[in-house]
A protein has these predicted regions:
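Iron-sulfur-associated redox domains of electron-transfer enzymes in respiratory
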Residues: 1-261, 268-271
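An accessory alpha-helical subdomain
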Residues: 270-280
Length: 280
């Protein structure tokens, strides 16, 4: 399946993303939004920025913030996904209009769910994510990083050679955490259905902007109603983004081919042993 076609491209401030979500509710474009929030420890009350859960919003005032860079980088906690939450907690948008933020793999799952009448695609406003993939078990992996105070992290970004953090003093810190193995060989880095998509690919971590792409007439209508500054994407940033996306896809295709070649060399017993392992 091909990625969804793009009508227009903008830069918006990451901090303005909640306004976009609020506008969907205020203008009656959707009845509910499947948003996201960082989990809070029941013991300490501390926010865990590495563990993100879906959350259902019905009123604009419920949306105070949104963990954009967290969701792009970590995805939802392992047992959650946008498509699963939509089906289980929002009745598959069968009788209400629902907005949700979906990774490329979520958009494929939505199509499959619609085939068995578990999701009504016509009632969805989909905000897709263009991404490299996501990192797993970051909180656990960072325990060995003695010189990194995780309470100082204000933003995160997956790079070519690890996970980069922006700290509250403006400094950055990179650690050797790569995307999940399955993500590294996935060649679907863009949503195949979406009204809007967002991406941080090609944008430096210090930059306050994210890329926003419009894919539908409903999304164009939303942009007109936003009341925030949405600048057409400059040609240099557009080229950097597109070049990096092409580079990421090429690397994924090469990894996929290499892994398939190695898989075909395995015996039946070895293949069964590999399938029994958890790869995510």
């Amino acid at each position: 399946m091909k990625a969804v076609e793009t009508q227009a491209e903008y830069l918006i401030k990451e901090k303005d993303f909640p306004t976009l979500l609020k506008t969907l509710l205020k203008e009656g474009m959707v009845d509910k939004i499947i948003g996201a929030e960082a989990k809070v420890s029941k013991k300490s009350g501390e926010v865990d920025r590495f563990s993100i859960s879906p959350k259902l919003w019905e009123k604009p005032e419920e949306i105070e913030s949104f963990p954009v860079s967290n969701l792009i980088t970590y995805g939802y906690a392992r047992t959650d996904s946008a498509s699963k939450f939509l089906h289980a907690s929002a009745d598959g948008a069968k009788n209400e209009k629902i907005a949700l933020i979906a990774r490329p793999c979520d958009t494929r799952a939505l199509i499959e769910l619609s085939k068995i009448k578990q999701v009504n695609l016509d009632n969805l406003f989909i905000i897709g994510i263009e991404d490299r993939g996501m990192t797993l078990n970051v909180s656990r992996e960072l325990r060995s990083e003695k010189d990194l105070d995780t309470t100082k992290i204000v933003k995160e970004k997956i790079t070519d050679d690890g996970l980069l953090f922006l700290l509250d003093d403006g400094k950055t810190k990179k650690v050797g955490i790569e995307i999940a193995d399955n993500c590294s060989r996935c060649i679907r880095k863009q949503p195949i259905i979406a009204d809007i998509s967002i991406s941080d690919i090609g944008i430096p971590i210090e930059d306050e902007n994210i890329i926003l792409k419009v894919h539908s007439d409903a999304a164009s209508e939303l942009i007109d109603k936003l009341g925030i500054k949405a600048d057409k994407i400059p040609s240099d940033i557009k080229k950097t983004h597109e070049d990096k996306m092409a580079e990421i896809l090429k690397a994924a295709e090469e990894k996929r081919a290499k892994d398939l070649e190695e898989w075909n060399k395995l015996s039946q017993k070895e293949k069964l042993e590999q399938l029994q392992k958890c790869t995510m």
